[in-house]
Every structure is written in C-alpha cells, then in structure tokens.
Amino acid sequence: QEISAAEFGRMWPAAKTDDVLAAFHVPDEGRVNPADLAMAYAKGARMRGARIVEGVTVTGVTSDRGRVTGVVTDRGTIAAEVVVNAAGMWARELGERTVVSVPLQAAEHYYLITDTVDWAHPDLPVVEDPDRYGYYREEGGGVLVGLFEPVAGPWSLDGIPTDVAFASLPTDWDRIGPYLSAAMDRFPSLHDAGVRTMFCGPES
C-alpha cells in the first residue's frame, strides 16, 4: 500500500525524508533465517519420505530425446523425472552440462552492520531504497546496510571454485565507497555510528 513520506518517517524516525515523494508499505512481508528455513524444509521433506544425500558432487545430467532423466554424481547416477538446478553460484556451470542456459554470474555483495544505535529495534520494517541501491534492517541492536549497486563486481569469471561456500572477499573501497556513502545518507546518523561488521562475499 502506498504511504506518505510522513508515514514512512514515523515508521523509521531516523530516516531522511525530505526527498521522499511516496513509499510503499507491505505489512505482510517478513524475513526468515535462511539456514533455519532450509532445515525446516529438509525436516518436512524427510517426514514425507524424501531421502537427502549430502556431500555429493553432480557431474552431469542425463537426458533422453530432449527430456531430463536424472543426474550423474560421483556416487553414481540417480534417475529422476524432475531435476531442479538449485546450485546457486554453480548453476550456470551445471546448466552448461545440459541444454539449459542459466544466465548467472557470481558477484560481490556488500553489507555492513553498525554498532548499537538507540533507535533501532526488531520491529522496524525492512527498507529498500532503489535510488540509493540500498536496503536496511535492524540487526542485533544496530542497523544492517546492504547494497545492490547497478553494476556489481563480478567474481571468479573463470569458474567458481568447488570448495567455496561462504567466502569473505577483500573490500574494494574505491568502487563501493560512493554507493555506501549514498546509502547511509538515507539515515544520516549512521555516519557517526561505529561499524561492527563490514562484509563482502560472493552471491549469485
């Protein structure tokens, strides 16, 4: 639902609103811990008879007359009527082993978490600011400021390493600094807040 700049300011009292023409509030939205959600899905799948096999490398996809029939792994071939490519950063490389093109490239993703600020609390709604390429939410008493810059820095163009899951990458301050400063201008007091965490990692 569309709300006024004043209503947005009441939801986030620390926000700069003099350049806001309108905002959109989605009261039914929420966020979850992705690891907890994955575990819940896995538990539900097992309860319904699924078998989950971990630590397996998929090396190919089998097909018959243009239709997928299973996957080839380092532990043998598994027949399947449906194969879902949920390989994240590796989805393009897996797709290349089939006739399916997955236009995806891992890129650097940045976020920082500030030290505790007195106006942050868990009931604050998540804010997305497309003009500043930023998103914001409360995190542990501070504020998480994340970036989705218009042209992200690509990572590992020659192929994604197979032994990387949660990599931490060096921060390219020259490239990301202006975006970060602009994003934090939405909440000017954050410029004076300490930084608890600054993170850059690959994301699909």
Describe the role of every protein-language-model region.
Residues R67, T77, V82, Y111, ...:
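Structural motif
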Residues T77-P125:
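Central helical "cap/lid" subdomain
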Residues V100, T116-S204:
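Active-site lid/adjacent beta-loop-alpha segment flanking the redox-cofactor pocket in flavoenzymes
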Residues S4, E54-V56, T197:
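Short loop/edge segments at beta-strand edges and connector loops
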Residues F24-V82, W90:
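Helical element adjacent to the flavin cofactor pocket in flavoenzyme catalytic cores
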Residues L21, A107-Y111, D131-Y133:
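Short hydrophobic/aromatic beta-strand or adjacent loop that forms the aromatic wall/cage
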Residues A5, A38, A91, I176-L180:
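A general structural signal for well-ordered alpha-helical segments in protein cores
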Residues Q1-A6, S101-L104:
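A short alpha-helix-loop-beta-strand transition element characteristic
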